[in-house]
């Protein structure tokens, strides 16, 4: 295989081209990475020296003959440089995918190295111009002293892609930190909302227990007062109404005796006397006159004297019974008031609990809104980071397309040179 130009008569053999290409190769490992730029520079300088020598010799040979002079265009980056382009872009794409997958900024060193090699466009141009002007003997030393740069350092699109990668590298950590803060805010808001739920439940339980205890206590007190009222009424009936009824009956019987009605007859019942029980409890016996049908005057006088006292006793029993009824009514009222007060107290406890629950629900709503806001902000931040990664991926795709175009142009130039 040979590369040449028919009109100029210049020809470079396959072995010589292989020797020149092999000059740019270096051993594997870290040393290969460090010497990559120097090897490429030496290979370019050697190639330029060989081409310069052949062109100069041929120019001197054809100067006197008057042949037409053919000027060659500046060659495009060689295959080794294009391979370096492809490797660089592939490495960027691989590291970008790893960064997007892990969300961990681990490609800082690679980006820094690339930026250090490509950040100074003027330095690269100056080094290249100086390398062209130097002679063939000084080319290796000049290439060795030149900064380690790739041949495509003049590409502004690639510089823009590197700048985008560096900016993205700086933003990833801040994106992760912000997303972490927003996630923690959402978590704290969720925990606060859960605490408010527990507080509402505790308030409801406390209100239920306190209201139930108060209502039970007041209901029991009211029931006891009602029982006292019933007991007072029962006692009044037993101690007042029954004696009053007996006195009324005896008083009626005595009144009938005074009128001569139901007078005892000895021939029928063989009763010869009448016993009368006084207010003091003393029983007085009166003999019945056997000689006539009416009571004696003494007997009638005694009965007439005791009638007002019996009537007074009957009235007093009635009054005491009325007093007992009033007392029972007061006890009944106390019982009703206790029960009503218990219900009122329970309602107050329920109202206070409802107020506390309302305040807790308001705080819960605020916490839920804060959680939703934090989640929305985190989602927006994640979407922005996703768009940034997509932009970086587009830049990498553009760089790959540019490398492919360079390869196509180089292939076209090589084809033209063969023909």
UniProtKB/Swiss-Prot annotation:
Residues 60-91, 338-402 are annotated as: Disordered. Residues 71-91, 380-392 have a biased composition (Basic and acidic residues). Its main location: secreted. GO terms for cellular component: extracellular region. Keywords: Secreted, Virulence. It is found in: Secreted. Coiled coil: none annotated. NCBIfam families: IpaC_SipC (TIGR02101). Belongs to the SctB/SipC family. This is Effector protein BipC. It comes from Burkholderia pseudomallei (strain 668).
């Amino acid at each position: 295989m040979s590369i040449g130009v028919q009109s100029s008569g210049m020809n470079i053999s396959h072995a010589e081209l292989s020797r020149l290409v092999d000059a740019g190769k270096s051993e594997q490992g870290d040393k290969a990475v460090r010497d990559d730029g120097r090897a490429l520079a030496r290979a370019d300088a050697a190639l330029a020296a060989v081409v310069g020598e052949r062109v100069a010799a041929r120019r001197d040979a054809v100067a006197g003959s008057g042949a037409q002079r053919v000027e060659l265009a500046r060659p495009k980056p060689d295959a080794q440089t294009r391979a370096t382009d492809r490797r660089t872009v592939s490495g960027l794409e691989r590291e970008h995918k790893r960064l997007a997958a892990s969300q961990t900024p681990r490609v800082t060193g690679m980006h820094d190295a690339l930026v250090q090699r490509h950040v100074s466009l003027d330095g690269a141009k100056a080094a290249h111009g100086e390398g062209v002007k130097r002679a063939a003997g000084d080319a290796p030393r000049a290439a060795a002293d030149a900064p380690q740069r790739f041949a495509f350092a003049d590409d502004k699109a690639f510089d823009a892609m590197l700048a985008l990668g560096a900016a993205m590298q700086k933003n990833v950590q801040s994106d992760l930190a912000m997303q972490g803060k927003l996630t923690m805010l959402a978590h704290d808001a969720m925990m606060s909302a859960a605490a408010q739920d527990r507080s509402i439940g505790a308030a409801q339980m406390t209100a239920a227990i306190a209201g139930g205890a108060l209502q039970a206590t007041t209901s029991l007190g009211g029931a006891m007062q009602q029982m006292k009222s019933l007991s007072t009424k029962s006692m009044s009936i037993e101690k007042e109404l029954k004696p009053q009824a007996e006195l009324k009956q005896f008083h009626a019987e005595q009144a009938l005796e005074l009128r001569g009605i139901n007078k005892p007859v000895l021939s029928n019942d063989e009763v010869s006397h009448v016993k009368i029980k006084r207010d003091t409890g003393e029983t007085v016996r009166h003999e019945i006159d056997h000689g006539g049908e009416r009571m004696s005057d003494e007997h009638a006088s005694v009965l007439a004297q005791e009638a007002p006292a019996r009537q007074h006793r009957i009235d007093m029993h009635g009054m005491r019974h009325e007093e007992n009824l009033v007392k029972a009514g007061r006890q009944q009222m106390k019982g009703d008031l206790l029960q009503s007060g218990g219900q009122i107290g329970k309602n107050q406890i329920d109202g206070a609990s409802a107020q506390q629950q309302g305040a807790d629900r308001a705080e819960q709503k605020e916490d839920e809104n804060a959680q939703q806001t934090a989640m929305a902000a985190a989602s927006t931040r994640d979407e922005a980071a996703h768009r940034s990664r997509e932009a970086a991926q587009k830049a990498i795709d553009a760089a790959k397309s540019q490398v492919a175009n360079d390869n196509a142009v180089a292939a076209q130039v090589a084809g033209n040179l063969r023909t």
